[in-house]
């Protein structure tokens, strides 16, 4: 199935006769539309009004769906088509709000002047008390330069703000962390590093987000070396954690021993290199990779992986194949070997459709729709903050992946991303790994 990336809500009136909702659903489905939520808005004596959420690929397909619904006749009427995604973003998705009401002069004196001066003097004498008497201990900066926003590319940090707000909302809901978007108007590595270092006293962690390759590698490495708080580039390590979890689950379903398998990575950008490093940290000895960039291949070899010259060679060699190239249809069915596990993770369209891979002989196949970073970063940072860790290392990341895999039902590739139990499990595993490393 092809991933859909336009969502619209159709308000449709149907006569109160059995089968009319089915006719609407059939009309939408025949044109390739995916129906999401169906909400009953009003039930009248002779009709029912419903909001039906539909996902389509593009505007052309949307217009075809609209025309098909309008052509049904027999009392079926399309009233409105609305963009609820855009509506949800009006005014932004997050806000900074006081935890304390200020309703009297006495409360004002405690929250602000003159009382706050005593707290300031205490922190001046004992800086570690800032973790008790300020929000710093629970705040993470979400930093972007806007050079690699989702699948949209270099669109700038302001255009990427909705993504950063989404990350902040997920931090809050899934891990109780205050995520603060920081938009940078530079893509110069030195300026980014300097800026993040200057703002770091106000945070207990740094999440680097949608920063392009190759400068993302230098930025993360330098910040991890020069700061004493956790730093993680989510496009690299968040993706790698969830990919490893998916591979563990897939191998469990396919009866494959992951640590003894040959793992191949197609595409060695930020995510691809991190995935290779994650599998090596997990204990996989044979990790192969291929990319059209010679420097990317060299980078993989510096980390201990093996570069191969072509996709065909990698597919012929490896038991487990992961692809993050962004090129739809790159993996031809003829390349697939019997019994392979294939995770084609590019969105909105994968390198090979799971159905095509399975028909070609793969033992297990999945695409990127279910392999979502949301499963990783909230719990990873919650665990790191709980442990008061100064870093996020590969032991902590492997622990996160194993926790996600342990929460995955048999037959699924990963758990449901909004399941709070999963995020609690990830946080606990990461905290334990961090504290074990300290000992």
Swiss-Prot record:
Keywords on record: Magnesium, Manganese, Metal-binding, NAD, Oxidoreductase
Q: Per its record, what triggers expression of this gene product?
A: Weakly expressed in glucose or malate minimal medium.
Cite the binding residues for a divalent metal cation: 209-210, 235
Stored SMART domains: malic (SM01274), Malic_M (SM00919)
Cofactor(s) for this protein? Answer: Mg(2+); Mn(2+)
Residues of the active site are 112, 167
Give one Pfam family. Answer: malic
UniProt cross-references to InterPro entries, sorted A to Z: ACT_dom, Aminoacid_DH-like_N_sf, D-isomer_DH_NAD-bd, Malate_Decarboxylase, Malic_enzyme_CS, Malic_N_dom, Malic_N_dom_sf, Malic_NAD-bd
- Disrupted-gene phenotype: Mutant can use either a gluconeogenic carbon source or glucose as efficiently as the wild-type strain. The ATP concentrations in the mutant grown in minimal medium with glucose are similar to the wild-type level. ATP concentrations slightly decrease in malate minimal medium. The mleA-maeA-malS triple mutant shows a decrease in ATP concentrations by about 20% and a moderate growth defect. NADPH overproduction is roughly halved in the deletion mutant.
Q: Which domain of life is it from?
A: Bacteria
The ACT domain is annotated at: 9-84
What this protein catalyses is: (S)-malate + NAD(+) = pyruvate + CO2 + NADH; oxaloacetate + H(+) = pyruvate + CO2
List positions binding NAD(+).
268-271, 347, 373
Record text on cofactor binding: Divalent metal cations.
Q: Which PANTHER family has this protein been placed in?
A: NADP-DEPENDENT MALIC ENZYME
Protein name (record): NAD-dependent malic enzyme 1
């Amino acid at each position: 199935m092809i991933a859909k990336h336009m969502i619209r809500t159709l308000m449709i009136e149907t006569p109160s006769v059995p089968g009319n909702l089915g006719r609407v659903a059939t009309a939408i489905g025949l044109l390739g539309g995916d129906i999401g939520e169906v909400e009953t808005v009003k039930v009248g004596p002779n009709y029912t009004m419903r909001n039906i959420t539909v996902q389509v690929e593009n505007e052309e397909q949307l217009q075809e769906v609209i025309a098909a619904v309008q052509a049904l006749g027999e009392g079926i009427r399309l009233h409105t088509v609305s963009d609820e995604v855009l509506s949800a973003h009006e005014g932004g998705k997050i806000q900074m709000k006081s935890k304390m009401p200020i309703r009297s002069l006495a409360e004002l004196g405690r929250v602000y002047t003159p009382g706050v001066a005593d707290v300031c003097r205490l922190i001046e004498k004992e800086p570690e008390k800032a973790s008790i008497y300020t929000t710093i201990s629970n705040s993470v900066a979400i930093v972007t330069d806007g050079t690699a926003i989702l699948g949209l590319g270099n669109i700038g940090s302001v255009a990427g703000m909705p993504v950063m707000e989404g990350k902040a909302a997920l931090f809050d809901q899934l891990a109780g962390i205050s995520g603060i978007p920081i938009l940078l108007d530079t893509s110069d590595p030195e300026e980014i590093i300097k800026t993040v270092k200057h703002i770091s006293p106000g945070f207990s962690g740094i999440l680097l987000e949608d920063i392009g390759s190759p400068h993302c590698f230098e930025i993360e490495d330098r910040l991890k070396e020069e700061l004493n708080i956790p730093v993680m580039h989510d496009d690299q390590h968040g993706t790698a954690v969830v990919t490893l979890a998916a591979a563990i689950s897939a191998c469990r379903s396919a009866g494959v021993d992951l640590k003894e398998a040959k793992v191949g990575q197609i595409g060695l950008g930020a995510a691809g290199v991190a995935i290779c490093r994650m599998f090596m940290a997990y204990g996989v000895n044979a990790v192969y990779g291929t990319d059209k960039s010679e420097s990317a291949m060299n980078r993989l070899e510096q980390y201990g992986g093996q570069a191969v010259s072509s996709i065909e060679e990698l597919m012929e060699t490896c038991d487990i194949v992961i692809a993050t190239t962004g090129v739809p249809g790159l993996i031809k069915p003829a390349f697939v070997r019997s019994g392979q596990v294939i995770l084609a993770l590019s969105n909105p369209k994968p390198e090979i459709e799971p159905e095509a891979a399975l028909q070609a002989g793969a033992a297990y196949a999945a695409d990127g729709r279910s392999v979502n970073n949301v499963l990783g970063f909230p719990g990873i940072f919650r665990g790191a903050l709980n442990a008061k860790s100064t870093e996020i290392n590969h032991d902590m990341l492997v622990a996160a992946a194993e926790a996600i895999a342990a929460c995955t039902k048999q037959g699924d590739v990963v758990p449901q991303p909004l399941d709070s139990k999963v995020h609690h499990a990830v946080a606990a595993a990461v905290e334990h790994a961090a504290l074990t490393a300290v000992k």
